[in-house]
Amino acid sequence: FLRWADGDDVLIDCEREAAGDLARRLTLYRLRRAIVIAREEELVVHWSATGDDGVADPRLAALGRRWLAPATGGAAVDDGWRAHRLAHGVAEGRAELGSDKLLWLECNAAELNGVSFAKGCYVGQENTARMNWRQKVNRRIVVVPLSAADLARQLAAYPDLGWSVEHRRVEAIDPALSPPWLAEALAGSSPGQPV
């Protein structure tokens, strides 16, 4: 998910199917605050590979721009978005990242600006901080051409687009097939720098 400031509100861009579960989980951390956690059914995510609309996707500049607005008649984030995102090697959502099955750094969170090592406490901090400190992430989510797929490691396949999303051991990832933004991590350097 992505977080958006909206005046006094905070909007979270997440999969429609995951919104209910996310709202329930966030409610657990409300801690007696008088805040409302609710779904905004009328808003959908829109995107553009270029242009000035919305804001740059915080994960990777090449992903283009995103914004939240009412639906305009069709699927706002569609197969075009999926093809664009996978071509840049970025996995997202439950189908590709699982749900509570993978460690956060295995999902390339450090490389895609999804974690801060300077922030205080958060759920999962212990494992995430230890993996970063030890500079050891044994497995990674990678997007590879379907022709190079390892079915035993496959999390999602898109035959129409020619891509496979997989959870592979780092030594089994061919650097020639990985995106440039992941090269430093695969070369054995630190999985990320403070954001």
Write out the residue ranges for each language-model feature.
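Basic, glycine/lysine-rich polyanion-binding surfaces/domains
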Residues: 1-195
